[in-house]
Amino acid sequence: NVIVKNRSQVFGYYDHNMMVMFERTGDHLKEKPKYTPRQRLWYIRAKEVLLSTGSIERPIVFGNNDTPGVFLSAAAKEYIKVYGVLVGKKPLIFTNNDSAYETALEFKKQGVEPIILDTREEQSSELIDAAKNQNIQIKFSHAVVAANGYKKVKSAQIAHISSDKRNLGKIEKINCDCICVSGFWTPTIHLSSQSGNKTKFDEKIDAFVPGKSKQNETTVGSASGIFNLEETISTSFEKGYQLSKKITNNDNKVSVPQVSEKKFTNHDKFWCVPLPDKKNFKRFLDFQNDVTVSDIELALREGYRSIEHVKRYTTLGMATDQGKTSNLNGLQLVSDVENKVVPSVGHTTFRPPYTPVSIGAIVGREIGKHSKPTRKSPMHSWHEKNNAVFV
């Protein structure tokens, strides 16, 4: 009694637990039957909704970070594990947390020697120790100052960074052909927020998480700010069981699978590398709309204080990705300049669609009960009689 929809994306969460989803039905087929649509739109009204939307890795901001060859660390790992593709043969891993060490270990498995720059002071964890045991070079308290290269990354300028993250040491050059960046993880709360859920800021993970639900909606996993696999599975199974029991009166519990994972240590609350003296590198926050750190600083100097005003002045988060990797870094910048905490700065509004959807899928041809009568002007019949051209 379970329907699984592959190649599908819920892009809007509306009142009365109505969700709108588009299904990609034809684009992936080499030979598709006649009249097969490219996409199909679904209107779903649910008694209960369980959101397991995950989280998105966020970058660390540094100079020339829009140079081709700069990747999110998780993306580089996925290229290796899912597609068998190496994004580079001289990778530089730049991180403030343990998850990027998994990427470094994947490179090592493929016979590639990565170098890790960790903004944290030297410490130990299961993943850090695993990297050391593989003889992976690790530079603690170091940061990428800027990427070098015109059409692709050819090297990087790196430096020791002070414990307060405000001062850089002597800059040195290190050869690399890609830079894999990890600035920790941001819960994907867009659908939860669209449902009317009031978000709250979690100081532990430096990100917003769902607060009290307004509709019959429950968020689980990393979308709720839980990044431990064992806890994610146990809480998700429990909440799923409670919802199933509520809807079906079925009291059959499902055994929770046992998992083993390497434990992560705390991440570094660091998101942007300071500019060195007499340097003016472009440091991009929003890659789609080319919004830089200096753009945000200018908006604040011009007197814009509300984050919604800063957003509109700079177009931060207004591209088709709606700031999925940039919004939180933008909020951190505003809070730093204004000497405020992030919750007092607020956050921008999440609006549907979560991902772009074609107008053709929304308009449709076979719309059934969602048909709406065509409204015509009082002059319509006269226009028809006089052979008007309708556009």
How would you label these PLM feature ranges?
Residues 1-374, 378:
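Residues forming the flavin
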Residues 371-391:
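N- or domain-start disorder-to-order transition segments that initiate the globular core
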